[in-house]
Amino acid sequence: HNPSYVTKGYKMVNDVKPGGVFMINCQWDFEELNHHLKADAKRYIARNNIQLYTINAIDLAIEIGMGKRNNTILQSAFFSLAKVLPEEDAIRFMKEKAKASYLKKGQDVVDMNYKAIDLGATAYKKIDVPAEWADAVDEPDTRELKGKPELVKMVKEILEPVGKMDGDSLPVSAFAEHVDGQFELGASAYEKRGVAVSVPTWDANKCIQCNQCAYVCPHATIRPFALTAEEAKNAPEAAKIVDVKAGKGKGTYQFTMAISPLDCMGCGVCIGVCPVNALSMVPQEGELAQQDVFNYCVAEVSEKKDMQDNTVKGSQFKQPMLEFSGSCAGCAETSYARLVTQLFGDHMYISNATGCSSIWGGPAATSPYCANKEGHGPAWCNSLFEDNAEHGLGMYIGQNKIRQDLAEETRQLIAVEWARPELKAAAQAWLDTMEDGEANAEPAKAFVKALEDSICTVDELAAVPQFAEHAAELKAKGALFCDCAACTIAADLLSKKEYLAKKSMWIFGGDGWAYDIGYGGLDHVIASKQDVNIFVFDTEVYSNTGGQASKASNIGQVAQFAAAGKTIAKKSLAEIAMTYGYVYVAQVAMGANMNQTLKAIAEAEAYHGPSL
């Protein structure tokens, strides 16, 4: 039913018995079908006498007013071809069911479904299978995957077979390097699933460069970039580039809105939020040239720090460190999580409750959380459903204890008489800012650099006459570095350098966890007065398990386990937390107020204590 299953090479046809029927829902003529079908699919179809049909339910659904809902058309086509019951009976039964289901929505909706049923029974076309398909040969794979070697290896050995629904073919040895459950960040960028039939196209002349489209995008597939003249000059031919129209960067940079058609889910959220209709949905195939533009901007265009700030517009020039997740098209949960990573992602820990946010956030081998060009990104972990808050608190306390020990070592280093002045200055700057995440970032980097520069090698020690004999003794023992107090402490600090920068600790979960099953732990954690941030994706039902009512569901709300409407009011988690008197509490909805959402997230991180 989705043409991307064919273009990605899923082994869909291999389950059809010889002489069976295989129908593809697509907008292609025969030449395009011949181009998109993989060689193994062609061979199977030809050698097993498969009856091949195509149907363009995509355009038919749009023409009759059903939008993306083409399932009724396809169901009718199925019954027409499968002959599991007389076609006339199948059409009659479907129409009776459509009337029973949709009459309350009006006769127009019923008639629309009738039309879809009638069209589906006649709109398919039989494809004459060429004899040469029996000997079709795959073109050689000339792709060169770029990135961290460990990540590329994981993508080739695990992600690609799993992505083609061929994971059962993997030997146990393929997971030898992942036995502890750790997977490399950023694998989702290699999927390029191409599942959207329609994707947005950008009108550069209409655009007012507000970046609201990128702000709401759940999948980080539409991103603004500020380009230097050189970067603009080297951009692919398909790039649409204009001058920055107002505010920061005007007269300095050029602007483009890069869209990734192969990562886009086609939800249309960006279209709905654009205040000047500068975006419109068009068929994906016509926009594939924009993929090169997106890839170029991500890989070659530098981040412009002077364009970034904690405003709706400025925040979107920051790299999202959650991208191309497997969440449902238009899912708002990922919009919020992505925004948090843009603000704090390079020094962020995440403890994630089981639920929707752990499914899109941590699927094995396809992590959508990613790192920046320096290799820094969110560290993500998932424990059990009910103990996520305690797990997150443990992550915070653990790294906080390590940092307190590092602070004590740093004070000892400063006290060493012969330690270099520039090292002492860097150490003091780190100590002075160690509890402020944003202010601590640069001092932490500078401290690491000063530590690396300060350690004296045995060869350097030997060059100093009064230490030559001691250097010879160290060399005889196989030592590489000086063993004085300053060098010893510096080496130990460097061995734990990933803990030097102040971490932004976030605890993610849904309302089923926060209001119900994990509430006891959440209450315990906010009562601890520790500096952690808790973000609840309140969907007002247990989303991942099928929409069951939770204590976050509203009175009268119809949900699973509340078919007649929930009889009690929504639990006020915010008011409960406020009774402690020292918990930062905020409710946010980016669709209602983008600025307030940003402000609340920034305030939560800045507050030295628990935030909800």
Segments and roles (model prediction):
Residues 90, 103-264, 271-349, 354-445, ...:
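Ferredoxin-type iron-sulfur electron-transfer modules and their immediate structural context
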Residues 1-161, 232, 236, 556-560:
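Active-site cofactor/cluster-binding pocket
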Residues 11-12, 33-38, 64-67, 129, ...:
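Short acidic, glycine/serine/threonine-rich loops at helix termini
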Residues 6-8, 30-32, 61-62, 208-209, ...:
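Flexible loop/turn segments at secondary-structure boundaries
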Residues 469-470, 474-495:
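Amphipathic alpha-helical binding modules
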Residues 348-352, 446, 503-517, 532-535:
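A short, small-residue-rich loop immediately preceding and capping a beta-strand
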Residues 21, 31-46, 292-308, 368-379, ...:
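Acidic, Ser/Thr-rich peripheral helices and adjacent loops at domain boundaries
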Residues 501-502, 516-531, 537, 541-612:
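Glycine-rich ThDP/TPP pyrophosphate-binding loop and its adjacent helix/strand module
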